[in-house]
């Protein structure tokens, strides 16, 4: 097993080598619009997965996948010449889903922004169901309010026989 840091460095080198080889060595017109986005190498340095994107419809993407499979031998040979490992890793090409995920995310954000604008428009013309401030009191601030239930002033109002020994009714 190789060091994970070494595998990461090798993956970056393979990414660069494959991208350059696609531009210089491979003359397939199906591979002209390919962008290599990432590469990953297993810790034993035997297998490399290369992620790519192609802008276009499904037909263009399918053609690019076929072109990469056809050029896999040439690309592996170029990788073997430009890296310093005993065994050249096998190459696997995987279409990267980042552009698809990004466009889906942008569509969701657009829909959320539209809903927020609709809610804001409805809220602008809405009225409160009750008072604007339900905790607002009509009693002036300088008037003292007797907030407790029972105190000494209230004892004078009640007959002594109605109270028990604790002063309760």
From Swiss-Prot:
Listed GO CC annotations: cytosol
Q: Where is the composition biased (Acidic residues)?
A: 140-169
Question: Could you confirm whether the keyword Cytoplasm appears in this record?
Answer: yes
Q: Where is this region: Disordered?
A: 124-169
- Coiled-coil residue windows: none
Subcellular location(s) of the protein: Cytoplasm
Keyword terms: Cytoplasm, Ribosome biogenesis
Which GO terms are recorded in the biological process aspect for this UniProt protein?
maturation of SSU-rRNA
The keyword Cytoplasm appears for this protein: yes
Lineage top rank: taxon: Bacteria
Q: Name one GO molecular function term.
A: ribosomal small subunit binding
Q: What is its main location?
A: cytoplasm
Please give the InterPro entries that the UniProt record associates with this protein. Answer: KH_dom-like_a/b, RbfA, RbfA_dom_sf, Ribosome-bd_factorA_CS
Spans of biased composition, class Basic and acidic residues?
Answer: 128-139
Q: Which family does it belong to?
A: Belongs to the RbfA family.
Describe the task this protein carries out: One of several proteins that assist in the late maturation steps of the functional core of the 30S ribosomal subunit. Associates with free 30S ribosomal subunits (but not with 30S subunits that are part of 70S ribosomes or polysomes). Required for efficient processing of 16S rRNA. May interact with the 5'-terminal helix region of 16S rRNA.
Q: Subunit details for this protein?
A: Monomer. Binds 30S ribosomal subunits, but not 50S ribosomal subunits or 70S ribosomes.
Q: What is this protein called?
A: Ribosome-binding factor A
């Amino acid at each position: 097993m190789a060091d994970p840091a070494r595998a990461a460095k090798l993956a970056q080198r393979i990414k660069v080598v494959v991208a350059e080889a696609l531009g210089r060595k491979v003359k397939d017109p199906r591979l002209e619009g390919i962008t290599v986005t990432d590469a990953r190498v297993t810790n034993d340095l035997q297998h490399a997965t290369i992620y790519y994107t192609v802008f276009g419809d499904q037909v263009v993407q399918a053609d690019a996948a076929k072109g990469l499979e056809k050029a896999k031998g040439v690309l592996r040979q170029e990788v073997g010449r430009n890296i310093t490992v005993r065994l050249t890793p096998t190459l696997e090409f995987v279409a990267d889903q980042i552009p698809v995920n990004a466009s889906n995310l942008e569509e969701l954000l657009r829909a959320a922004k539209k809903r927020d604008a609709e809610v804001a428009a409805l809220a602008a013309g809405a009225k409160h169901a009750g008072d604007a401030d339900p905790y607002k009191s009509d009693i002036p601030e300088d008037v003292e309010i007797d907030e407790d239930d029972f105190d000494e002033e209230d004892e004078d109002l009640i007959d002594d026989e109605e109270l028990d020994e604790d002063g309760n009714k």
